[in-house]
Amino acid sequence: MRVLILGSGVIGTTTAWYLAQSGCEVTVVDRQPASGLETSYANAGQLSFGYTSPWAAPGVPGKAVKWLFEQHAPLSIRPTRDLRQLAWLSQMLRNCTAERYAVNKARMVRLSDYSRDCLNALRASTGLEFEGRQLGTTQLFRTQQQLDAAAQDIEVLAQYGVPYELLSPAQIAQYEPGLAGGGAQMAGALHLPEDQTGDCRLFTQRLADLATQAGVQFRYGQQIERLEHAGGEITGVQIDGRLVTADRYVLALGSYSADLLLSLGLHLPVYPLKGYSLTIPIVDAQRAPTSTVLDESYKIALTRFDERIRVGGMAEVAGFDLSLNPRRRATLEMVVNDLFPGAGDLAQAEFWTGLRPATPDGTPVVGATPYANLFLNTGHGTLGWTMACGSGRYLADLMQGRTPEIDTEGLDVFRYLSTRSTRPHREAA
């Protein structure tokens, strides 16, 4: 079976790997000169299998109003003329109920838990290295209100058997001794021991190298223009003015996936959430984090690499704008100085921004479409790397006619389509 994958970020690359391992003839196309150079380039560095939550949560609408007037707000909305932005925000607000939050979080935890197992198996079989650590995530709560609000998340963790430990303020330094050098006061913390860290770009590019050795063809520097279709199937993809064909197609273009589907009559509610990061050289390892620390107040993660600290977070609903906002850099620097003062050389930090492909309910869109030979793998939001291996393995199983190893309810695009849309019949490969 010939498969054409559109996009070579972490999602497209992991999908290519699993399809190649299944015996498929895989080609990956991307406009960049290498894999992992857009949203995968400098994300927060977290593999957050335990800390998996949708942005659409109870209380967020009220907080969003308050954040409009805060300098270091974790979420900001900059209206554009794109009506899809308004539609996406409206759908997100409808998912901010306790009932919808519980359903959406459960779906996300289910996929993240499976993805952890897939990643561990991948590392064991390939020896893939990406400055990874397996020391967990420590989520910091600055207020008792934040600590109390975590109770619902803990219930979901317990339901799915995800290990966790609640920490008193005195216990936090056992996992992150560098925090003792800062002056921030904490009400407590939640430690998730199975979470991991690493450099997503290194992971993506080194996995692309392994995939190439396994027979995958990567075609870089090529512009994907449109999908051609007839009779309920994709007949090819226009790439740099020529038609490229395959037996089946996978769309893994992140925030840009929705535009390509419009000509098919599919309205995919995936919209960019702009995030920022700083990558800081370490000057004092004793003052630096040992793994990932997540500041609940500012929704910012601080992650330790070998000789660097990656500080990332925040979300701007601002369309496809990739300009660097100096106010966001100031927020990242403020959090670093508050929690780990003197750990890194901020003057040498690399400031970056990327567009995370987000759905209104937080759950990605992975699986079949109304077009018999078109599959989607997008919409992972801030958790693309966390869910990448599980999403890629599940999609490979689905496309090969194998029974997936997890419950796939609510993962595909049909949860957003009208009841008149039907799932196409497919023969096993």
Curated annotation (Swiss-Prot):
Pfam families: DAO. InterPro entries: DadA, FAD-dep_OxRdtase, FAD/NAD-bd_sf. It comes from Xanthomonas campestris pv. campestris (strain 8004). Its EC number is 1.4.99.-. GO terms for cellular component: cytoplasm; plasma membrane. Belongs to the DadA oxidoreductase family. Oxidative deamination of D-amino acids. Keywords: FAD, Flavoprotein, Oxidoreductase. FAD binds at residues 3-17. Its cofactor is FAD. The keyword Electron transport does not apply. It is an enzyme of class 1 (oxidoreductase). One of its GO terms (molecular function) is D-amino-acid dehydrogenase activity. It comes from the Bacteria. This is D-amino acid dehydrogenase. One of its GO terms (biological process) is D-alanine catabolic process. It catalyses: a D-alpha-amino acid + A + H2O = a 2-oxocarboxylate + AH2 + NH4(+). Pathway: Amino-acid degradation; D-alanine degradation; NH(3) and pyruvate from D-alanine: step 1/1.
